[in-house]
Amino acid sequence: MTLGINLSRVIRNTSKASLVALTIGLVTTVAGVKYSLAQQKVKLLGSGASFPAPLYQRWFKDFKDVSVDYQSKGSGAGVRDFTQELVDFGASDVAMKDDEIAKVKRGVIMLPMTAGSVVLAYNVPGVSNLKLSRAVYVDIFLGKIKNWNDAKIQAINSGVNLPNLPITVVHRSDGSGTTGVFTKHLSAISPEWKSKVGEGKTVQWPTGVGGAKNDGVAAQIKQIKGGIGYIEFGFAKSAGLPTAALQNKAGKYVSASQDSVKATLAAVKLPGNLRAFISDPDGANSYPIATYTWMLMYSKYDGSKGVAIEKMVEYGLNEGQKVSAELGYIPLPNNVRQTVAAAADKISSGYQIKLK
């Protein structure tokens, strides 16, 4: 009898223990599934520059580890969204200035992720090989040269049949890092431009019509006979628009290409804060209007977001650079990749960026 009672107790206790173990196992499994799903659902929101948008959108489409929504709004809107902490990261073709950085409570890490050129695309029927001197393209955007057969344009385009066609300048209508790059260059080469118009993401244009973002300007140029405007090279390429060879600091006429923009970047040394302004580069073969373009990161994120940010940057520095040239951008030099990786690796202690 005693043995039977003990067996019953053993059975009951064993059943209870099994039930408890099963319950703990289920809870642990469910919690693990929930945690795994939570990891998979990390989403990042970014906004800003339209200049690198085709490249970034390609990266984020191909990159499967993190869901990234990048909204191409223009650098001005991107910096504003980033400063107000409405996004997880921003993007700008012009590095943030000290007074802008001071407004960001979580700190700022600026990472140059690619580079490219600002070209002067045009729509002049029958003209595919156009050269523009520094003085001429400044005067076009000042509104002083008004016609395509102007003597100053003809003088540097011997043998080109320039039509009697009004020039229509097309510029950005939104806050734009591309505008910042272009007007900084014009201010560097022309005292008149610097005093009358100046530089910035938005300026008071002396002449012309506006278009939103790089693709909007490209569309306007394509639509307007006699149009000329400044856009990132890839947008001109996609729109099938010819671009002018521009006179550089050494006096040579240079078209935008992988080699000429690499020559420009080679003449520029990035400082420790990774902020560089390329207003009028040296070098006989340098293309005169080129820029790095930056992702803007906070110094502090919560655990999952910080890891996701580092994974996104790692992808951009590795696989992302391989498709840059295909879309008209310039892959980062290896020394720049290493510097960017080291800076980005400070964002999260839970992940280490590895370059391939």
Predicted regions and their residues:
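Flexible loop/hinge segments at secondary-structure junctions
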Residues: 35-356
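Assembly/oligomerization scaffold segments
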Residues: 7, 27-28, 86
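Glycine-centered signal
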Residues: 12, 30, 35-37
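N-terminal secretory signal peptides that target proteins for export/translocation
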Residues: 1-13
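Bacterial N-terminal signal peptides
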Residues: 16-29
